[in-house]
């Protein structure tokens, strides 16, 4: 577009003058027609032939990949562990276990996360309140005869086992000495396809794991893992506006009267109200209305 610069002053027309052309610079690359590979370039086979020959004679099988051996060991250990669990699972049958033979699974409860120094007599004191107990068995190691931290209790009445499970349960727990123990039903003979934790199953984590470990440090320290020690006190009653905590300057009656109880006349039934009509507008029409009108170029 050509502009008539004669109508502008000299200081303004000087701003619209074209710039000088770019200076010529010699290209750094060769032209496309003259490009070619250096004919003096040769391979490295002659240089490495002697070195490679000595290396292959010294290491005929190559050096071991030690950084990959660790991954292979972990992979093999997982495969062996899975095969071992499969063999143990095939031999596991709770219905033929001599320790629980001739017992009703619906009258039996499972107690986990027990203290390791707890015996049957002390355990009976915590569950005798639910009903008469027929049998208590704390599972122990066959070699060391030490407790494994869980036990089974058989009641004489199935209602007693249901009451113990509903009152204590898995989430609430019961405190025995310095540990929070859980109570569950016997799932080995009542739940199909159930596997114990030692065979790759189970329903939860360890007792020493923190329940609030996913929280940040300052929140996890304030919370407690014992549900019985948590504070479930009701909230304080809502304060009235007349209390000393609320100043009269902010929530006083004068502000409310001036804002919500002014001297505006109330609408009565006889007062005519304007009819509200809604006109539909498409999206394109609303866009055109919101856009400003184009400015016309001045004609000097």
From Swiss-Prot:
It is found in: Nucleus. Keywords: mRNA processing, mRNA splicing, Nucleus, Ribonucleoprotein, RNA-binding, Spliceosome. It holds the Pfam family RRM_1. PROSITE patterns: RRM. One of its GO terms (biological process) is mRNA 5'-splice site recognition. Present with 736 molecules/cell in log phase SD medium. Involved in nuclear mRNA splicing. This is U1 small nuclear ribonucleoprotein 70 kDa homolog. The gene is SNP1.
């Amino acid at each position: 577009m050509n502009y008539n610069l004669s109508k502008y002053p000299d200081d303004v027309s000087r701003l619209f003058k074209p710039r000088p052309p770019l200076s010529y610079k010699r290209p750094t690359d060769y032209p496309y027609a003259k490009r070619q590979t250096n004919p003096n370039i040769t391979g490295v086979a002659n240089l490495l032939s002697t070195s490679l020959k000595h290396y292959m004679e010294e290491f005929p099988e190559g050096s071991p990949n030690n950084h990959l051996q660790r991954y292979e060991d972990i992979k093999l250990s997982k495969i062996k562990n899975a095969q071992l669990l499969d063999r143990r699972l095939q031999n596991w049958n709770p219905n033929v276990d001599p320790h629980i033979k001739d017992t009703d699974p619906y009258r039996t409860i499972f107690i986990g996360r027990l203290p390791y120094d707890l015996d049957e007599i002390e355990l009976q004191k915590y569950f005798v309140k639910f009903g008469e107990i027929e049998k208590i068995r704390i599972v122990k190691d066959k070699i060391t005869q030490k407790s494994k931290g869980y036990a089974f209790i058989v009641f004489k009445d199935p209602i007693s086992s249901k009451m113990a499970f509903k009152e204590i349960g898995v989430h609430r727990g019961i405190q025995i000495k310095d540990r929070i123990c859980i109570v569950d039903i016997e799932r080995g003979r009542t739940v199909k396809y159930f596997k114990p934790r030692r065979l790759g199953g189970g329903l939860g984590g360890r007792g020493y794991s923190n329940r609030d470990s996913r929280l940040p440090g300052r929140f996890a320290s304030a919370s407690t893992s014992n549900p019985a020690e948590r504070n479930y006190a009701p909230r304080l009653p809502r304060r009235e506006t007349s209390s000393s905590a609320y100043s009269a300057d902010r929530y006083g009656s004068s502000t409310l009267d001036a804002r919500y109880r002014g001297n505006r006349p109330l609408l009565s039934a006889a007062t005519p109200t304007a009819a509200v009509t809604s006109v539909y507008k498409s999206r394109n029409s609303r866009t055109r209305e919101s856009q400003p009108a184009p400015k016309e170029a001045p004609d000097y």
